[in-house]
């Protein structure tokens, strides 16, 4: 998973560009996390709790839903999360890389640390 963070200094907005298949991670960072360091601390806490367990933690944001497990992290649009599995299978043809992303827990934690370091610089 490759990514690049940018800040538009004229507008004060942040951008997170991710490699193909992980675009939803960027949307989640910009739209749901932004500069919320309290939220980042809460996510780090749950990452530590979930490691080496089979627990799962879900966080519904304004636009996206984050699902943490010991194996993977899923970020998806709230509308997709609210669908049942059966509805999801029927609508899979509408899949869009910007709607859902999956990565490993360690990669996610590393990316989150990079985002935090980036926003703290500005």
Curated annotation (Swiss-Prot):
Covalent S-S links between cysteines: none
Signal peptide: none
Pfam families: UPF0231 (PF06062)
UniProt cross-references to InterPro entries, sorted A to Z: UPF0231
Top-rank lineage group of the source organism: Bacteria
Record family assignment: Belongs to the UPF0231 family.
HAMAP family: UPF0231
Name of protein: UPF0231 protein VF_2154
Species of provenance: Aliivibrio fischeri (strain ATCC 700601 / ES114)
